[in-house]
Structures are given as structure tokens and as C-alpha cells.
Amino acid sequence: MRAKATRNIHQFSTYFKNFSFREIKKSMLRKIINLGLPSAMQMLFEVALFTAAIWLCGSIGKTSQAANQIALTLATTTFMFAMGLSVTATIRVGNNKGLMDYKNLIIVARSVFLLAIILETIFGILFVILHNFLPHLFLNMENANQVIENKEVIIIASKLLLVAAVFQISDGIQVVVLGALRGLQDVKVPMYITFFA
């Protein structure tokens, strides 16, 4: 174990030869913190909201919590596509801003927004069409002892999926727009909006 740790330290030490903390400029650190902290707070507010929803459902009962977890898992899975587009928007918009190519920046931003709207609309439609079927994928329907509980979970989860279908589109657009704003280095106003929303 020690030999492996020593080998790893030796491998990485080549990257830090002649490194000094004096090389790090305070102005650059300040800029990174001014961009990173509001973005981190933004994500914290969103995660805290979903965590609070799970906690509240847990206090209501296990069937509500199970149904909420099913709907949240499905919504979060489809939300990852929008998160990927958000990263794309951040990179592409930031790149075009750095090149001062504002015409292409607008084209890129609109393209990513449109792609997010199309994808999230498709997911929303699938949630509406399959809202009674999707909860079955998460439950053991062969267990005779849980038939009544499973039916209750399916009823609640199917209703929650209809709600998720609606907020799927707005949530997808919101995260992609925030990614584009991050690319423009505009992070403080979105942080306040996320806090109050």
C-alpha cells in the first residue's frame, strides 16, 4: 500500500516541479471565486429544494415517498440531457464570447435552446403517454403481499409524472439558459433568481 502511494506521489510530482503558490495571482483567484461561488450557490438552492421535497414526502408516508422517488428518478434522468446541453451552451457561448463572434454566439445559443425545448418536450410527451406504465418499472408487481401498496404508489406516481411532464420543459430551458449565461460570465443575477424561485 505504501509503495503504491509513494509511486503515485512520484508520478504526480513531475507535474509540480518548480511550482510555487506565489505564481497564483490574487486577481485570477478572485475572478474564479466570483464566477464559481454564485454558480455553486445556484446548484445548492436547486438541490436543497428537491431534498426538502423528498424529506416532506417521507414525513407523509412511505407510499408517497416511494411515488415521489419514482417520479423524481425519471425526471432527473431526463433532466441529465438538459444538463449536458447546459455544459455545451457554457462552452460554446464562452468560446464565441472569447472570439468576440457575437453573431455566431446568438446562433449557438438559440440552437442549444431549441434542442433543449425539443428534447424536453419529447420527454414530457412520453411522461404523459406512459405515466401509468413507467411506475411499474420500479416496483415488484409479483409480490402478492404488496399489491395494495404498489397500486397506491402507482396512482400517486402517475399523477406526479403528469406534473413532471409540465415542469420538464421549463426546467430544461432554465438549465440551458443558465449554462449560456455562465458562458457569458453572468452568474450573480441567475443566482438570486434561483434563490427566490
Predicted regions, residues:
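Hydrophobic faces of transmembrane alpha-helices in multi-pass small-molecule transporters and flippases
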Residues: 4, 20-52, 77, 81, ...
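Helix-terminus/linker motif at the lipid-water interface of multi-pass membrane proteins
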Residues: 44-71, 77, 95, 133-147
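Short alpha-helical transmembrane segments in multi-pass integral membrane proteins
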Residues: 1-36, 93-167
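Loop-to-helix entry region at the N-terminal start of transmembrane alpha-helices
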Residues: 34-38, 63-72, 159
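Juxtamembrane/interfacial segments around transmembrane helices
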Residues: 12-17, 42-45, 89, 171-174
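Small-residue-rich hydrophobic transmembrane alpha-helices
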Residues: 67-131, 171-185, 189-193
